């Protein structure tokens, strides 16, 4: 089949208009010839015989009359063994190899294979000759790090196939033919270990989509207890600049109870990506004891790279996540930041001269954001195993204004909202998730009634604090002042975590439940205080005791002695325990 060719008839920034004769489809890849180089671009609109393409490189040097060659392929990623531990740009070019070939500053027009053509993988066949197979069925497996990588029938092969031949166990490259299948018409199709899949099409080779109910344990107390995320769920982290969005995502990627983490750094500062690249190879995965980099894929399209590739980087990340979900693995995709992706959409929409929506974002922004988050989910595969993709996206609203279109469109589709507050980050309260503005629709690691009880003290404590700002401490009753101190204690010792401390950085569910029960006892106890000063000094001492308690390894002698000290300190001034707290503690036992 001859490839369609066209000519450039107009240039507007990184968008070019091309007149063509023949067949061109939306999202098809085209290459613009500039001298000896070919620049990759994607068809974003077709009107009659003129197509608009967004170029993924700087368009300097392109002129009217330049030749554009359409490939006939949609914008796709290559799927196969060897993805884990890689660092890609938004178009799935491996950056370490690019640096070797082109130096530290990216040259345009250089595109490399996403998977190594020389690395050999030990293939073990599972299917037998004569088997009837359909897309996503298992041909065999190869070990990839600590995972078993499934080699499957390509997802774009619809219909049924008969396995004609399959290679015996041995070492092969991703280009070697490992099997041959016959289609319903008798055509023989050779299969390798890798294949391509369009990034903007969701992978749907599963038997059933399930409701996310199992909590994704992040080992962050505030997230697991108060604002949980489910495996296969979605959540967003909006917050002003410098409030700790990226740091929170890094902590989640280190400690979350998932098999694979994919970080899509979309339009963020390069320094943050560099931090991940230097940190992850040195960090140990608590499950396997190997480096975190072995279970991580990083797609970085930093703010210094072309804007057009930002949109592609988000879709590349979610497609790789769906691919590993097909192997029955739990995948966490962290998109940082979806605001930059939305800005890339806005820029393209402006160039296409579409009618703008609010704040000049395209009118279809909501449906684009919804379509992206809908690709998350927990699924049951045809062999009965389960896999999940959990998506966490940060939003960077200008000035921390949560009323802007990207935040509002995201809030409509996500299952949990972790709103970061400038006030909390300035007060060095980490993580800076606002305990009253944030919410979650997913089940917590603790019983719902216990969580509600704790939140009621946070809310009432904040109300008393606001009242004290107006009438002063003198105009507040001692009962209200104690409620304020209890809310402040819960915030300081449970919601806040020290990520620089080895013990406090990652807190197991058992430890969270244990500490929370002690806090329920404190919250439900009425204390005998003569004055507010006595109450303040009592709770200050309790706070310091709890911080030492949090830094003691679970089950150690120091942990037990700190706990005994806390219980003794509570008994000194305790009067009685309210009925609701008694009931909650009985349930916990």
Curated annotation (Swiss-Prot):
It comes from the Bacteria. GO terms for molecular function: ATP binding; proton-transporting ATP synthase activity, rotational mechanism; proton-transporting ATPase activity, rotational mechanism. Keywords: ATP synthesis, ATP-binding, Hydrogen ion transport, Ion transport, Nucleotide-binding, Translocase, Transport. GO terms for biological process: proton motive force-driven plasma membrane ATP synthesis. The keyword Methyltransferase does not apply. ATP binds at residues 239-246. Its EC number is 7.1.2.2. It catalyses: ATP + H2O + 4 H(+)(in) = ADP + phosphate + 5 H(+)(out). Pfam families: ATP-synt_ab (PF00006), ATP-synt_ab_N (PF02874), ATP-synt_ab_Xtn (PF16886), ATP-synt_VA_C (PF22919). CDD domains: ATP-synt_F1_V1_A1_AB_FliI_N (cd01426), V_A-ATPase_A (cd01134). Produces ATP from ADP in the presence of a proton gradient across the membrane. The V-type alpha chain is a catalytic subunit. Belongs to the ATPase alpha/beta chains family. This is V-type ATP synthase alpha chain. It comes from Treponema denticola (strain ATCC 35405 / DSM 14222 / CIP 103919 / JCM 8153 / KCTC 15104).
């Amino acid at each position: 089949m001859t490839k369609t060719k066209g000519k450039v008839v107009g240039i507007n920034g990184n968008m070019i208009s091309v007149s063509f004769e023949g067949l061109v489809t939306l999202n098809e890849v085209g290459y613009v010839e500039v001298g000896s180089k070919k620049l990759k671009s994607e068809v974003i609109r077709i009107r009659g015989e003129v197509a608009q393409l967004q170029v993924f490189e700087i368009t300097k040097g392109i002129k009217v009359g330049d030749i554009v060659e359409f490939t006939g392929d949609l914008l796709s990623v290559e799927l196969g063994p060897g993805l884990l531990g890689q660092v890609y740009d938004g178009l799935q070019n491996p950056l370490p190899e690019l640096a070797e070939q082109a130096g530290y500053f990216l040259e345009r027009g250089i595109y490399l294979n996403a998977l190594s053509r020389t690395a050999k993988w030990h293939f073990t066949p599972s299917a037998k000759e004569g088997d009837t197979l359909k897309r996503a069925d298992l041909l065999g497996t190869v070990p990839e790090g600590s995972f078993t990588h499934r080699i499957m029938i390509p997802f774009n092969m619809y219909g049924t196939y008969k396995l004609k031949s399959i290679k015996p166990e041995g070492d092969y490259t991703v280009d070697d033919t490992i099997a041959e299948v016959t289609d319903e018409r008798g055509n023989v199709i050779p299969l390798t270990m890798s294949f391509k899949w369009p990034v903007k099409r969701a992978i749907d080779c599963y038997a059933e989509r399930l409701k996310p109910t199992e909590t994704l344990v992040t080992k962050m107390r505030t997230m697991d207890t108060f604002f949980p995320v489910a495996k296969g769920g979605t959540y967003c982290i909006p917050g002003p600049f410098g409030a700790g969005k990226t740091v929170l995502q890094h902590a989640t990627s280190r400690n979350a109870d998932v098999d694979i983490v994919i970080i899509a750094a979309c339009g963020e500062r390069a320094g943050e990506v560099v931090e991940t690249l230097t940190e992850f190879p040195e960090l140990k995965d608590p499950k396997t004891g190997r480096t975190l980099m072995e279970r991580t894929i990083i797609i970085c399209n930093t703010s210094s790279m072309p804007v057009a590739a930002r949109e592609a980087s988000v879709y590349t990340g979610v497609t790789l996540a769906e691919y590993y979900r097909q192997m029955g693995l739990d995948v966490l995709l962290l998109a940082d930041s979806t605001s930059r992706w939305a800005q890339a959409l806005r820029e393209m929409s402006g160039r296409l001269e579409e009618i703008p929506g609010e704040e000049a974002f395209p009118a279809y922004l909501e449906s684009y954001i919804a379509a992206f988050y809908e690709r998350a989910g927990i699924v049951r595969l045809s062999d009965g195993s389960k896999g999940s993709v959990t998506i966490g996206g940060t939003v960077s609203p200008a000035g921390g204004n949560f009323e802007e279109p990207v935040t509002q469109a995201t809030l409509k589709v996500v299952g949990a909202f972790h709103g970061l507050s400038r006030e909390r980050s300035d007060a060095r309260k980490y993580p800076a998730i606002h305990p009253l503005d944030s919410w979650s629709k997913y089940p917590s690691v603790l019983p719902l009634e216990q969580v509600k009880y704790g939140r009621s003290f946070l809310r009432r404590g904040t109300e008393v604090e606001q009242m004290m700002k107006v009438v002063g401490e003198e105009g507040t009753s001692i009962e209200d002042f104690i409620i304020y101190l209890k809310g402040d204690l819960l915030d300081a010792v449970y919601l806040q975590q020290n990520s620089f401390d080895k013990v406090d950085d990652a807190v197991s569910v058992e430890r969270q439940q244990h500490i929370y029960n002690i806090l329920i006892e404190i919250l439900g106890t009425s204390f005998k205080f003569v004055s507010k000063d006595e109450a303040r000094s009592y709770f200050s001492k309790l706070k310091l005791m709890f911080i030492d308690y949090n830094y003691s390894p679970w089950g150690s002698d120091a942990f037990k002695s700190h706990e005994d000290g806390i219980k003794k300190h509570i008994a000194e001034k305790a009067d009685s325990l309210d009925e609701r707290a008694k009931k909650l503690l009985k349930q916990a036992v």
